[in-house]
């Protein structure tokens, strides 16, 4: 609402630094620390800078990028990739991309297996998580009535035998696979899927929340058991229609119905901005919409060159590398060139070399 339906990384950094002050862990905490050092995403999630780049973090806060883009599967996947890189990198981004695609598709697809396989189109065939998801589907086919066996095999390969560097209960790949198994063995039943999400273990509360939300989109609010949405006598609306904030600075308590209405309005705004339209009580979406990251400079470590040592420093990152980069002011050290947002060559002279760069659309 404050920054529009396609915020910039600079906007995200500003919001994070203002609202997130405590109760933050792992990749989120490391990213926030890097923001306070002056960095912007995606450098805050870079595997060379964020020691927790491989953790689950972006899967937990991803839904909004997708349920505001109903039916716009590729758009939701691309935006999820962009957002995940605030905290994460490499294969740890992939579960977030898959969830993003599934959330967007869930408005129209009611078949669990089809939902998963269609979302896999948004990941490269050789992606680590994509390969592992296909393994989970094969396990389900082999042991359709034995989720314990499937979970045992999955945990052996992706937790017990995981390389020491990335072996944690919060590993993004591991927990993303737990979610897939819960979906497959839950077979569309909300309570069973929720129970299985918890039974899979590891960082299970987060998988339970993500998968439960996904089923809610697929089958609607009426599919949710009242024993869960109205557990206290006297509640007339789900969860008593109250969101109570206890963890984020200067975020007010709110009516859940009001939050839904505001989110719906943002979804309509986004749909219409990407070629969709509203006609009467019907909303038409553009399923071919693509997410193009906002054009912006992203701030990472300053270049630190050494005489006689080759450099390949890049000001450009994956979200702005395709724009036009120009050196418009200043002088480079002898032996160094600038092209496509990158420094290359071997400096031969010491000194300070202030430069001004310009970024524009091609």
Model-derived features with residue positions:
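Extracellular/luminal low-complexity segments enriched in Ser/Thr/Pro
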Residues: 342-350
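Surface-exposed or secretory-pathway low-complexity segments enriched in glycine-proline
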Residues: 319-341
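Accessory "access/gating" subregions that flank catalytic or transport cores
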Residues: 34-53, 62-73, 81-86, 96, ...
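Solvent-exposed, low-complexity, repeat-rich "mucin-like" stalks and linkers
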Residues: 294-324
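A short beta-strand micro-motif common to beta-rich folds, especially ectodomain repeats
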Residues: 351-361
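Extracytoplasmic mature domains of secreted/periplasmic and thylakoid-lumen proteins
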Residues: 4-56
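Catalytic phosphate/nucleotide-handling subdomain of diverse soluble enzymes
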Residues: 91, 99, 104, 179-268
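Acidic, carboxylate-rich catalytic segments that either coordinate divalent cations
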Residues: 126, 130-165, 221-296
């Amino acid at each position: 609402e404050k920054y529009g339906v396609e915020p910039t990384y600079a906007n995200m950094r500003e919001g994070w630094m203002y609202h997130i002050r405590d109760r933050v862990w792992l990749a989120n905490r490391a990213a926030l620390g890097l923001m306070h050092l002056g960095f912007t995403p995606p450098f805050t999630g870079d595997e060379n800078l964020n020691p927790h780049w491989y953790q689950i973090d972006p899967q937990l806060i991803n839904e909004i990028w997708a349920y505001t883009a109903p039916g716009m599967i590729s758009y939701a996947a691309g935006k999820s990739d962009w957002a995940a890189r605030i905290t994460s990198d490499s294969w740890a981004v992939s579960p977030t991309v898959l969830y993003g695609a599934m959330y967007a598709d869930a408005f129209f697809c009611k078949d669990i297996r089809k939902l998963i396989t269609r979302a896999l189109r948004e990941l490269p065939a050789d992606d680590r998580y994509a390969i592992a998801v296909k393994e989970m589907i094969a396990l389900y086919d082999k042991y359709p009535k034995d989720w314990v066996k499937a979970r045992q095999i999955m945990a052996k390969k992706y937790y017990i035998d995981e390389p020491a560097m990335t072996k944690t209960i919060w590993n993004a790949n591991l927990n993303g696979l737990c979610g897939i198994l819960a979906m497959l063995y839950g077979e569309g039943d909300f309570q069973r899927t929720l129970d299985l999400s918890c039974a899979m273990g590891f960082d299970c509360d987060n998988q339970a929340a993500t998968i439960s939300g996904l089923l809610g989109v697929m089958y609607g609010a009426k599919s949710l058991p009242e024993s869960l949405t109205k557990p206290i006598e006297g509640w007339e609306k789900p969860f008593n229609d109250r969101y109570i904030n206890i963890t984020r600075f200067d975020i007010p308590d709110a009516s859940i119905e009001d939050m839904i209405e505001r989110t719906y309005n943002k979804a309509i705004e986004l749909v219409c901005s990407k070629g969709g339209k509203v006609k009467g009580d019907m909303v038409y979406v553009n399923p071919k919409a693509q997410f193009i990251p906002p054009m912006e400079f992203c701030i990472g470590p300053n270049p630190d060159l050494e005489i006689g040592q080759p450099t390949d420093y890049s000001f450009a990152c994956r979200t702005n590398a395709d724009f036009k980069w120009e050196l418009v002011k200043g002088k480079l050290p002898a032996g160094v060139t600038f092209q496509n947002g990158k420094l290359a060559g071997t400096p031969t002279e010491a000194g300070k070399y202030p430069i001004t760069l310009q970024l524009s659309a091609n």
